[in-house]
Amino acid sequence: DLEKKGWQTILANNTVNETTPDFSKVTTASEKGLYKADDDYTATTGMKSYYFRGAVDNNWVKFGKDSTGKDIYWRIIRINGDGSIRMIYTGTTAPKESTKVVMTGEGTQIGKSAFNSNNNRSEYVGYMYTVGQQYGTSTSSTIKIAIDNWYKKTTLWTNLEIKALVADEIYCNDRSVINSAWSSTGSDFDYASLTRMSLNGKPSPSLKCTNTSDKFTVDSSNGNGALTYPVGLISVDEVAMAGGKLATSNSSYYLYTGQDYWISSPTTYSTTTKYAYEFLVYNVGIIGYNKDSNVNGLNGIRPVINLSSDVILSGDGTYSNVYTVS
C-alpha cells in the first residue's frame, strides 16, 4: 500500500463541506471546516482546492528552521488544485491548548515593513512593479525584498532536502480593474479585488487569478516567472474564504493574530491623498482597506509557502500532534 500523499492525509482527517459558505458573514467561534472551490489548476487537473475556514485547530504544520535554527510553525490555508499545500507563517513558538485556534502577537510575523516605500502612484500596489505599466514586474516591492531576505536564510532555501519539498506555486497580486479604467495617477479607481469583496453586497472571493502577469511564480510555465524564491503573501480572496470580511471584526478564525499584517491584493488609488492602497488583515481580524492600508504603512509580514504535492505528512495537524513533513 503506497503511503498517502500529504493532501490525501488532510482530506482523510477532515470532512469536506459540500456547501459554499455565506461570505457576507464572518465565521463564528463554533464555525470551522474544510470547504472546496475551483482554483487556477482545477481546469487542468480536475481537482478542487480545499480551504480551511473559521475556528480550525487542526491545520498546524512544523516545517523548516529560520536563520537562528528555530523550528517554523505554519497554518495550512488550503490544498491547491494540483495537490500542493499552501500555508502561512505563524512563528517559531509551538502551539498549545490555549493557542490551538488563535495565536496572537508579533511573533506570528517575521517583522514589519511597508508594502512599498513609494506610495504616490498606483503601480506601487505591485508585489513587483514597473512605473508606467499596470502589470509590470521589473522592480521588487519593499515587502518582497524583506520576504526574500528572510527566506534565503531559512533551511527552506539553504537545506537541499527541505528545499526539494517546497513547490513553486502561484501567488496572486491581482492588479486588474473591473468598473473603471486604470491609470498611474490620473484618476480614482478600485481594483477588482476590492470589487469582489463588495462592502454592501455579497462578497465573491475567487481562487482564480485573472492575469498571467499577476500570477507570481519562479518558473514561467504556470505564471509570470518573475520570482527568485518560491514564497509570497496571502490574497484577500483567501482571507475572505478563511472567515474574514470587510468592516466586520473577527477574532475567532485561524488567521486572526491581533496584529495588522499585509495581504497581496490591492484596493484603490486615490487622487485626493495621492496614495496607493493594499488590503490588510487589521488587528481586530477585519479585512481592512483604507486609512492604515496606504502601501507605505508599516505592517506585519506573514510569508506564504507551498509544500509539494508529493510530500508525506505525519501527525494530524492538532497542537499536540502537528503535521511534520517528509
Region roles according to the model:
Residues 1-326:
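Long, domain-scale functional regions
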